Swiss-Prot record:
Record-annotated membrane-spanning stretches: none
Signal peptide: none
Native organism taxonomy: Bacteria, Pseudomonadati, Pseudomonadota, Alphaproteobacteria, Rickettsiales
Family annotation (InterPro entries): Rickettsia_antigen_120kDa
Short name of any one Pfam family annotated for the protein: 120_Rick_ant
Cellular compartment(s): Cytoplasm
Keyword Coiled coil: no
Bias type Basic and acidic residues, positions: 14-24
UniProt source species: Rickettsia typhi (strain ATCC VR-144 / Wilmington)
Residue segments, region Disordered: 1-33
Gene: sca4
Source organism, top-level taxon: Bacteria
Assigned keywords, A-Z: Cytoplasm
GO cellular component entries: cytoplasm
The name this protein goes by in its record: Antigenic heat-stable 120 kDa protein
């Protein structure tokens, strides 16, 4: 064999190799041994169900007005089309091209096969199609595709293969009254009943059918299942797959099983609708009546289906009514391909990973069936010792599924020859691109082998990957390129389902990470490529399975935890940077984070980083959702301005109450305001809506939204107006309306000052700033003038004189006492009378105190309203608070002892009520951060040394030892010191935390105290 660089892999393609009879017999014996170990030989009925809350979107919704080639179906339906129907069309195409060359133009291969579909749907061509069915070779190929296709689908989408909610046994229950009647209740994954299936077994000796070769076969037993036509119980979707039975009523072996499948998709009302039927071909009936049972001829045997002619016609009618498709090949394949989905009302269904259940019961069968010899099932040769083999125990330790381990027993000489010849062709001097091309071609040979099932292909790809990584003739960096080429081949392969690709990728990660033939650097590079391929998978379920599987493989690998963390963060960055919807990213990253936290493979710091990114993604999603809601409200033609304002206020209130930081709230409110300002509504309507937004913010509960936060959010409202792409005059009116709204609800003036600050600091030109500032000032001045006038008028009407006020209070108190007829118990008891007279005296004294405080408040208010008053803006108050915080933090730092610092905390933070609650809490927060930082620095620099000068007196650092020896000085001692004092640090942090709790409870204590004082005293 030539070893030049231009060598074609076809030289050692196992498909071209001839085998001796001895080799075939040896391989057949190995296959029999392999299948004798398997317990997966007999199949049973299966179904897949999903509730409306977790099902995939309806096919009619996702494929509305789209041709078949562009439809997005659920994975099961798509797998049947790709694994069976498309391959059967290709077989028919090949037959027709060979027998009728003149049809080449009509049956040419296209992306959506429009021409061929038109050909197959034309009744004039049925005679040609029937001839194809009658051709022995074509019929055999069609049957083999159907058997292998169903076997692959049912194994791929099974729970044992790791598919979420995969195949599990159907629980048929015999009825007491008759042994030939069984039933089962089908429920969605929410536990709600979708339907009850009844199966009736019919014994007979009067049904005889003729096979294609003329041989007569008697049907002794068959069954009927009452497939539901309409369902109106619970919401959801389901697929019912019933295995075809042999003529004697028994189940076939796994390698010969075919199914009759009814696909029910969730309809507009949430109830399942019959949308498609998948049946073997060509379908026939034993008789012409509605009770005639369906049957097929497969592999020279007769099989009955659990459906009658009458039931089949009713189901097909319902399929047509629901705009579904029949994928029954005997009814011409075109019915699956040419029928375009009719118009339907599109429901926006979240694209989330469905939790579907596809059930399959597999029983043991004593009569083992041996499959035909394929190119990957041929005898082993002595040369395999020269090829590196992945032994079953090695594979299991690498995280390879058991299904693949079973396939290892059937690894053929063809694969061994392939690996051997690859190794013989790879040389160190060979160009990397040549090496990559060689591996790609080998991968294509494996994946395109039509006679191999998926388990075989998967194992062979794994063996090829392991062989590549262990090959000493490929340098480490080149192995990255070669394996990447292999991964690209898998990515681009059209014959492999997405869910199958995810399984191959998982195994690739396990082999790569556990390989001893490459360094961590190369492992990471290969893993990045695997993740890229996984993220390119279009099917949401398969993509999620792939990323989850990769995550599991990383966790289970034998690399160090610190390396696992690094790999985790790399995968996280790849997912985060991919162009997915926010919901998709949340699900992928959330699942990764959960696994990482549970297994403790990433540090708390990295966990926090991922949490922050998830919060950011959530914010973006919330923003888009909010924008959509606002647009729907603004564009609603049936709602007036009042209703629009109310609805926008509801959205605003929900944002204000949401458990997110004030910065995010501000961002969302700004978006809402800007959308309103830029809408096509009339200026007066926009003004009213924004005015409503301002009112909601200004009057929102101070508990959930402190004044400072209100100011920050009001700044975002003003920013939304100022930066909106609308006319200046409209912005002026909207700004005026916003300020008016705040004053109408008596909002804090600091909130209004926040608007001024935004206008002054905005990026708009100076002339626009002046216009907007003027509109705000006009409103503020108008409101302030009105308040001053009202207050002055009220004060002037009342002649407040303290002496007269005291007399009035006493007289009124006496009048009240007389009115209540307060008397002593004994008129002749003068002492008791004095007690009685004390009542008005004490009452008037109390009221005098109250009036005195009222007068002080009035005078203070007058002073505030005077021109000499020192009214501070919101920004000034904010700056003053910041300075006060910095000043007290500095004062705390100047305290030298722990005791002094503890006293400072009590006197200046807990007991000092002259400082606002917010300022004191901010000081504590700053001090806690500083203490934590000092402790962290100490722990990080335990070996740091500090000069500690030991002196006798405080006059000088260094003094002579004695007068007699002045040249000998006291030495500096370089010692290791506890630079923070961990115990003292803990005491201070504890004191700060206690102080914070005390301050935070002040409002609660205050409200409780007031409530107690204001309660009505008992008599």
């Amino acid at each position: 064999m030539s070893k030049n660089d231009n060598q074609d892999i076809s030289e050692f393609d196992p498909l071209n190799r001839e085998f001796t009879e001895a080799e075939k017999q040896q391989q057949m014996q190995q296959e029999q041994e392999f299948f004798s170990q398997s317990i997966l030989d007999i199949v049973d009925d299966g179904f897949i169900v999903a509730s409306s809350s977790q099902s995939t979107p309806s096919i009619s919704v996702l494929s509305n007005s789209l041709p078949h080639g562009d439809q997005k179906s659920d994975p099961i339906t798509e797998a049947i089309r790709k694994e069976i129907l498309e391959k059967q069309r290709d077989i028919l195409r090949e037959y027709l091209a060979n027998t009728n060359p003149e049809l080449a133009a009509q049956i040419a291969k296209e992306e959506d096969d429009k021409k061929f579909r038109a050909f197959l749907s034309n009744q004039d061509n049925y005679a040609l199609i029937n001839k194809a069915f009658e051709d022995p070779e074509t019929k055999k190929n069609l049957e083999e595709v159907e058997i292998v296709g169903y076997r692959n689908i049912l194994s791929t989408y099974s729970a044992a293969s790791g598919y979420p909610g995969g195949f599990q046994p159907v629980q048929w229950e015999n009825q007491v009254s008759a042994s030939d009647l069984r039933s089962t209740v089908v429920k969605n994954d929410a536990g709600e009943e979708l339907c009850t299936l009844n199966e009736t077994t019919i014994k007979t000796n009067s049904l005889i059918v003729a096979k294609q070769d003329g041989t007569q076969v008697q049907i002794n037993s068959y069954r009927e299942i009452d497939f539901p036509i309409k369902l109106d119980k619970a919401d959801g979707s389901m697929h019912l797959s019933m295995v075809a039975l042999k003529a004697d009523g028994t189940k076939p072996a796994k390698d010969k099983a075919v199914y009759f499948t009814a696909h029910y998709e969730e309809g507009p009302n949430g109830k399942p609708q019959l949308k498609e039927i998948s049946s073997p071909q060509p379908l026939k009936f034993v008789g012409t009546g509605d009770d005639a049972v369906a049957y097929i001829e497969h592999g020279g045997e007769i099989y009955t289906l659990a459906v009658t002619r009458g039931k089949y016609k009713a189901m097909m009618k319902e399929v047509a009514l629901n705009n579904g498709q029949s994928v029954d090949l005997s009814q011409t394949i075109a019915e699956d391909l040419t029928k375009v989905q009719g118009p339907s009302h599109v429901r926006h269904t979240p694209i989330i990973t469905p939790n579907q259940e596809l059930e399959l019961s597999i029983e043991t069968h004593s009569n083992q069936q041996v499959p035909p010899i394929t190119t990957f099932n041929k005898p082993l040769q002595p040369e395999i010792s020269q090829t590196h083999q992945l032994q079953p125990q090695q594979a299991q330790s690498s995280g390879i599924p058991n299904l693949v381990l079973n396939a290892a027993h059937a690894l053929s000489i063809s694969m061994q020859d392939l690996l051997h010849n690859i190794n013989a062709s790879l040389t160190q001097k060979q160009d990397i691109n040549k090496q990559s091309d060689l591996i790609k071609e080998a991968a294509n040979t494996i994946l395109n082998n039509k006679k191999s099932d998926f388990a075989e292909k998967q194992y062979n790809i794994i063996a090829l990957t392991e062989n590549t990584l262990s090959n000493k003739d490929i340098i480490a960096d080149a192995k990255v390129n070669v394996v990447s080429a292999l991964l690209e081949t898998i990515q681009n392969d059209q014959n492999t389902l997405d869910i199958q690709k995810s399984k191959i990728l998982e195994a690739t990660v396990a082999i790569t990470l556990n390989s001893e033939n490459i360094e961590l650097k190369q492992k990471q590079q290969i893993l990045e490529k695997v993740v890229d391929v996984s993220l390119s998978i279009k099917d949401d379920i398969s993509r999620a399975v792939a990323i989850d599987s990769i995550t599991d493989a990383v966790i289970k690998s034998n690399i160090a935890n610190k390396d696992k963390e690094q790999i985790f963060m790399t995968i996280f960055d790849q997912v985060n940077s991919y162009e997915f919807s926010n919901i998709t990213k949340q699900k992928l990253l959330g699942s990764m984070l959960k696994k990482a936290v549970e297994t403790k493979v990433i540090s708390p710091e990295q966990q926090q980083l991922i949490h922050q990114n998830l919060d950011k993604i959530t914010t973006e999603h919330t923003k888009r959702d909010t924008i959509e809601k606002v647009n729907n409200i603004l564009l609603d033609p049936f709602s007036n301005t009042v209703l629009k304002t109310t609805n926008i206020q509801v959205i605003t209130a929900n944002v204000l109450d949401s458990p997110v930081p004030v910065e995010i709230k501000s961002e969302l409110i700004q978006v809402v305001t800007q959308k309103v300002a830029e809408s096509a509504l009339e200026p007066k309507d926009k003004t009213e809506i924004v005015k409503g937004i301002g009112k909601i913010i200004a009057t929102h509960s101070d508990t959930s939204l402190p004044l400072y936060d209100k100011g920050v959010i009001m700044e975002s409202v003003a920013k939304g107006i100022v930066e909106s792409k609308t006319d200046l005059r409209e912005r002026e009116l909207i700004t005026e309306g916003l300020v008016n709204g705040i004053y109408e609800v008596k909002g804090d003036k600091a909130v209004v000052h926040a608007i001024s600050s935004v206008i002054a600091n905005s990026n708009i030109n100076q002339s626009e700033k002046e216009v907007l500032k003027k509109s705000q000032d006009i409103v503020s001045e108008r409101v302030l003038d009105k308040e001053i006038q009202n207050l002055d008028g009220e004060l002037k009407e009342k002649n407040i004189e303290e002496s007269k006020l005291r007399d009035d209070i006493y007289n009124k108190t006496q009048d009240v006492a007389n009115e209540l007829n307060i008397k002593t118990f004994l008129d002749d008891n003068h002492g008791k009378r004095e007690v009685s007279e004390e009542v008005p005296k004490n009452t008037s004294s109390l009221l005098n105190d109250i009036s005195q405080r009222t007068i002080e408040k009035v005078n203070n208010l007058r002073a505030m309203l005077s021109q000499d008053a020192n009214l501070k803006t919101f920004e000034e108050k904010k700056d003053e608070s910041t300075k006060k915080v910095d000043e007290l933090v500095k004062a705390f730092d100047n305290k030298s002892s722990t005791e002094e610092q503890q006293n400072f905390i009590k006197s200046h933070l807990i007991d000092n009520k002259t400082l606002s609650r917010e300022v004191r809490l901010q000081i504590i927060d700053n001090l806690l951060k500083a203490q934590a930082q000092k402790r962290a620095e100490t722990i990080e620099n335990l070996s740091a040394k500090t000069e500690d000068v030991r002196v006798v007196s405080g006059k000088s650092e260094l003094e002579p030892i004695s007068k007699d020896e002045p040249y000998i000085q006291k030495a500096k001692m370089v010692v290791e010191r506890d630079r923070v004092g961990i115990k003292d640090n803990i005491k201070i942090m504890g004191a700060l935390i206690n102080a914070r709790d005390s301050i935070q409870s002040e409002n609660l204590n205050k409200s409780t105290h007031i409530k107690k004082e204001s309660s009505v005293p008992q008599r």
